[in-house]
Every structure is written in C-alpha cells, then in structure tokens.
A protein has these predicted regions:
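C-terminal accessory segments of proteins
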Residues: 1-185
Length: 185
C-alpha cells in the first residue's frame, strides 16, 4: 500500500517538476468546514472520535512509532477499515480508527462527479486525491525517519521496484516488441 502510493507520487512529481505544490499533500487533515486546508469549503467535514484520534496519531507519528512494529502494520492501519480473509471476506476491523485512507477518500467524494474520489480511473485528476495521498506519504516518511530508515534501504528499494513492475504490468506500460520507446519505464 505505502510503496505503491510512493511510486505513484514519485512518478507524478517527476512528470510535473515545476509544480511540487500540487502533490505535497495536506499540511494537516482538515478537521472542519472552516479549516483553511478544507479543499471543499462549501461542504461540512465530519469525523468520528475514532477517526480524529487516528488523524492526531498519524500527524504526530513520531510519538507513536512503537504502535507499529513494521511499515506494513502502519500501512494496514492507514489503508482500509476491513481485512479480507477466506473465513470472512467482508470483515471489518474492530478499531474504528483504522482505515483513514478509505475515510479520506469518502470525506471528499462527490457522487456523480467525473473525478469522484470514491471510484473510477479519473480520480487521479482530482486535486484532493493528491492532497490526501501526499499527506499519507509524508506520514510514512516521518515514520521511516523516526525509525532510522532511509531511502537507501534494500528492502525499501525492492518494494518500490516491485510496485513499479506491478503497476506497469497492470497498466500495460511496458514497451511491446517492435514498438521501442526511448524513455520506456
């Protein structure tokens, strides 16, 4: 989850190097309608107490690194509020603070929008998509720094390469025989 989003954000930042502010992410997750960070000030922003606790925890991740033994644990906590298992394919996590990524998408989804954050391939055209994913990426980077991890770590490098290969295969971005590309990924 985290490596896939890092690969995606790094790619978009490289594609638009003159506009880093577009992909920097929220400075903080907006808590209410009047919050200056709220990208849709005409809409009310509502969070449950558990979601606010998750936001506070992640915005102060350096004080909570011991709650996540691994980056995978952090990623699962952020990603979605459900965990699929063969026994319970639609099971939810009992911790209501888990799944903030899912809740961030839901908070600013607009039904019927061609760039709805809830579903669809066009969601990457929505500026808020980059605000929320940039924020998550910053939280992950701060976690890594607090753990003494660097971008030179072999496991980190392998995770990014793996996500790159998977994304390029899924999106069919690899050059095909007879169709060489000078700058192929």
């Amino acid at each position: 989850f985290l490596a896939m989003h890092r690969h995606m954000i790094d790619g978009i930042r490289k594609a638009f190097p003159g506009h880093p502010e577009l992909f920097a992410g929220f400075d903080h997750v907006p808590r209410g309608q009047d919050d200056p960070e709220n990208p849709m000030p005409w809409r009310d922003v509502r969070w449950s107490a558990a979601q606010l606790a998750a936001i506070d925890k992640l915005e102060h991740i350096e004080d909570h690194v011991d709650e996540f033994a691994t980056e995978d644990e952090l990623g699962l906590y952020i990603e979605v509020p459900f965990r699929w298992t063969p026994e319970n394919p639609s099971g939810f996590v009992a911790d209501g603070s888990s799944g903030l990524h899912f809740m961030l998408h839901a908070q600013w989804s607009v039904a019927g929008s061609p760039v709805n954050l809830g579903i669809g391939e066009n969601l990457i055209l929505n500026r808020v998509f980059w605000d929320l994913h940039g924020w998550i990426d910053t939280v992950w980077e701060r976690y890594r720094v607090a753990r003494g991890l660097t971008r030179d770590d072999l496991e980190y490098q392998e995770a990014l390469v793996g996500q790159c290969e998977e994304m390029h295969d899924q999106l069919d971005l690899r050059p095909h025989a007879g169709h060489a590309q000078e700058d192929a990924p």
